[in-house]
């Protein structure tokens, strides 16, 4: 199933988490069964179509609920915890 997102928060969160955990786009794509170009398109807001399996894999990898990936500003949340 494909999930269509309405805004760029998912892409911003994905980029933040990927960089925080020191993954390249290529590495992340291999882990979640996708392609680096797809990761780039999500992060830059060029695409809002996210396969539900990829979404689940991202959530599991980073230990983040899917709802937080979509709705929350994770960068702000992580900064407030410091």
Located regions from the model:
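A short, Lys/Arg-rich alpha-helix, primarily the initiator
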Residues: 1-20
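Short, charged recognition helix plus adjacent turn
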Residues: 3, 60, 68-82
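Conserved hydrophobic/aromatic packing and binding residues within compact polymer-binding modules
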Residues: 14, 28-29, 39-42, 69
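Residues within the helices of the helix-turn-helix
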Residues: 15, 26, 56
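The alpha-helix within a helix-turn-helix
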Residues: 18, 29, 59
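Recognition helix of helix-turn-helix/homeodomain-like DNA-binding domains
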Residues: 33-49
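Short, basic-rich loop-to-helix N-cap that marks the start of a DNA-contacting helix
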Residues: 46-60
